[in-house]
């Protein structure tokens, strides 16, 4: 169970982080590194008490190399603050996770984040030029710093995704892109989720990588976009130079229609843009006593269909499961990520009378079913 920390400390620079870490190391005091606290896996919870290191005081853009397209930024900088600073230079990092408004650069790095425009701009690990890190003994190291290297291993990669367990990121150098002059959108209905996956795979394999390429199954399309519940929906958005954007969307259109797609109102994309970070609907269900969570699974294209069907069937078989849906959120040359949402309700009696233990049991049962099915089908959590 989580424990109360003995102190919450907010360092203002690298030197203060060094002093805090050194003192804690000498006394075997555990440190939990936090910032926006938007994560849902508990990494910012002090399980062993000790000291909570709140990095939000170390915030701001230090410098911008407009010629090279590199921004030097402090770890406690929240997403909107970073993008507002870069907009003055007509630049963007292109990293827009659902937690964009309430998460920080350091958190993105620590949790190996992927933004909603990742098909074009990549995940956070692909944006990192270099890092400054305070290690567990209080020493400071710098990694990377160049566009590429002909030697290895890549030291930065040791800390990306380590969730503050191997060191404290105190500074980052990230790649920045020129703000795109053109944005275009399209949307499609598919007769089945499987048809949509085939179209996505063909587009990606043809190196058509629009900034946004998201496929919703019929259940999630209806909930997210107000569909009729009969069709899966693909939304497409691309930024860039006009010729490149037109060519990219033309390839996606060809692949979509080859698998039975029909044009959907482009307003579906506008609706997603306006509401993409809104979780109020799910939160409202939680307040009514429903059990809700999400799970993201990566799989090669050859196993995406089996993962999708396996997770849906296994989770729906749990007593109390009410809804299981999915969308493909990130695509790669060899596979994609499926983002599942499951909703459960205690069915034995009035939901308001259900105990915490019953809710926890249902939650664990749905998670166990979903995870085991995903792994059995060849997915990676």
Name every feature range the model reports, one short phrase each.
Residues 375-381:
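Alpha-helix capping/hinge segments and adjacent helical runs
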Residues 35-38, 98, 215-218:
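Short, ordered loop/turn segments at secondary-structure junctions
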